[in-house]
């Protein structure tokens, strides 16, 4: 059977009512406003509230993030990293804490295999399981321990909106590796945020476990990944989140 073809111009001439009229400038603006959030890159995330009161989340290129935003009371949620179909919001600040108060079987992703650990993207799910497994002798759910600290972390604007407590987690190994690979760009964006702390040349905890007494640890100095770090050891903790309304 022959395939029938038709000129688009002829179809438009007969079906003009089916086409929504839009000014070229409006269409270009809409496309340009959205495309930056779809492409790989590093952005500063905020929930606007000063000029607009809708608390809408925005991803702003670092070169467009100016002091006047913060002087007007805007708060940066963190640094948005988009890469290869994954995205993370890296908190502006960090702390140093033990992973847990003792040996724990949390149900979070556990492996002693380095390659398997590097494929773990389930930081959010890991954190929820770590917190749920908290118990006497192996506390994990308070701000004194890595997962609990991340879960209680919060960044909000003047309306109390933003990335509130319960929306942050302890990154998995794969999430930490993505942060490490983009450390210089992330630190540049962090340098533009008032009160932010840059990623340091230190060991950072992952939510990926390697045993009941150990979890994975990533060095942001050279990318060394250690799977036998005792959970009682005090390491760097940097909460992460997602681009959320």
Residue ranges and their predicted role:
Residues 2-164, 231-245:
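Short, compositionally biased
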């Amino acid at each position: 059977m022959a395939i029938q073809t038709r000129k688009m111009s002829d179809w438009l001439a007969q079906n003009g009512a089916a086409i929504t009229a839009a000014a070229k400038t409006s269409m270009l603006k809409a496309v340009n406003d959205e495309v930056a959030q779809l492409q790989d890159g590093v952005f500063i995330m905020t929930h606007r509230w000063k000029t607009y009161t809708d608390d809408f989340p925005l991803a702003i290129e670092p070169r467009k993030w100016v002091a006047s935003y913060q002087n007007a009371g805007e708060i940066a949620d963190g640094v948005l990293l988009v890469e290869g179909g994954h995205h993370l919001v890296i908190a502006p600040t960090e702390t140093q804490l033990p992973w847990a108060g003792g040996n724990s079987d949390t149900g979070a992703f556990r492996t002693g295999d380095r390659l398997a650990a590097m494929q773990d993207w389930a930081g959010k799910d890991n954190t929820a399981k770590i917190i749920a497994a908290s118990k006497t002798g192996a506390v994990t759910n308070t701000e004194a321990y890595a997962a609990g600290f991340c879960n209680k972390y919060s960044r909000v604007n003047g309306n109390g909106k933003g990335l509130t407590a319960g929306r942050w987690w302890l990154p998995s190994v794969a999430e930490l590796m993505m942060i490490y690979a983009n450390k210089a760009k992330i630190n540049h964006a962090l340098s533009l945020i008032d009160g932010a702390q840059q990623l340091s040349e230190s060991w950072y905890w992952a939510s990926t476990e390697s045993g009941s007494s150990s979890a994975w640890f990533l060095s942001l100095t050279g990318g060394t990944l250690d799977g036998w770090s005792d959970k009682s050891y005090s390491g760097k903790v940097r909460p992460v989140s997602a681009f959320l309304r």
